[in-house]
Design a protein with these regions (language model features):
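Helix-adjacent hinge/juxtasegments
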Residues: 51-77
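Active-site neighborhoods of divalent-metal-dependent phosphate/nucleic-acid chemistry enzymes
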Residues: 74-117
Length: 141
């Protein structure tokens, strides 16, 4: 079974069905529901997602969506070591660095799925687009 860390942008696309990315993000998350893949998300992503969705809808709606998401992904805590690693890294985007070093805390994570692969140029893990992850899962079947 493949194991991926989902970047915050993919999770927002999925939860909000943001065009034109929402449909492919939903297709990817459905693969997890049928046991083809296991998904992880950084705990920090939940904070960011709540802030963004709350501004578009309501606090209650944001919390409801996050509760649903918590059943679909394994939440990986972001700790002090991860923050220090991100601060000392060559990543130009701090949030991407947090995602990357969070992924490294879980040795079973095989890739990071993002809509912004340029943000992960310093990554030693493979970085896939949502479409690339779907293709990889189809080829593994």
């Amino acid at each position: 079974m493949r194991q991926y860390l989902l970047d915050t942008n993919v999770l927002i696309d999925y939860l909000t069905l943001r065009e034109p990315f929402g449909a492919t993000a939903a297709a990817l998350l459905r693969a997890g529901a049928v046991g083809k893949v296991r998904f992880y998300a950084a705990s920090l992503s939940f904070v960011t997602i709540e802030y963004i969705i709350r501004r578009q809808t309501s606090t209650a709606q944001a919390r409801q969506l996050l509760e649903q998401l918590a059943h679909v992904v394994e939440i990986v805590p972001v700790g002090a070591v991860t923050v220090r690693q991100a601060l000392a890294s060559d990543f130009t985007d701090f949030e991407d660095a947090i995602q990357y070093f969070t992924a490294l805390t879980q040795p079973t994570i095989q890739a990071i799925i993002t809509r912004d692969p340029k943000g992960f140029r310093a990554s030693s893990l493979p970085v896939l687009s949502v479409a690339g992850a779907l293709l990889e899962l189809d080829n593994a079947a």
